[in-house]
């Protein structure tokens, strides 16, 4: 049986939907760790086991994973744990380790972990917890305690506003100039496409992907400058991209936009990674999985237009 975590989150819920919509895994072979969500009322009728699990309560994790042979571990969204250069086992990797240790205690043999579409090593602070988790899984595998698969999920099409100067106002935005701390090509990938690829991996015999680390990302790239042009076209007015130093970027969003400094400083390192080409992914795994199903990756332009309409 496969245990799914974070099944109400953006990626986790999309993966669950892909599994069910495409009938990739019998619902009786699934367990999810968030029984309180209203969205699961219909899933109970499909015999999916729902159990309570809390990263801060190891005993609840072990109970949730009992009887499962595999775990799909989606990284925790508690990014504030990573702020201020959190030392080892004090960042988000602490939650990941708690889940992994509980899974092994419960008898889980294989762990699928959702990492992120940056390099390893990486200059991006957002990647630190992922790198630490990947290393922990590798150590456990060397000790013969489990097998694992690392899926480095591409940067979401839907997350472009975060990289594009916190452009969360979307169609309500009035800025004619967007300040960032760097630019580079990114292999943006839609959540539904990644979810489908992930679901296909989860449904395959685990030996097929065991011990592998790979990216689930489309190959076509767009820079933030490209996004500025797309946004300008959709809005019918020019929106310029302005690249400044990390310090200028941090001061601007803290002093002018009222954002929390630890958050902005943590995120600003992402632009060093973009400049180094870390997010320009040359891995055909996802496109091959989509092609087998007669699908093609959703273009970034389409996502941006949908979000701005």
Give short role names for the model-derived ranges.
Residues 2-26, 30-31, 35-40, 56-59, ...:
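Oxidoreductase cofactor-interface core, primarily capturing Rossmann-like NAD(P)-dependent enzymes
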Residues 41-69:
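Conserved Rossmann-fold cofactor-binding substructure of NAD(P)-dependent oxidoreductases
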Residues 51, 70-75, 113:
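Redox-cofactor binding/interface segments in oxidoreductases and associated redox assembly factors
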Residues 62, 100, 191-199, 297-305:
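Short, amphipathic alpha-helical "lid/cap" segments that border enzyme active or binding sites
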Residues 63-64, 102, 136:
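CheY-like receiver
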Residues 209, 247-309:
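A hydrophobic C-terminal alpha-helical subdomain
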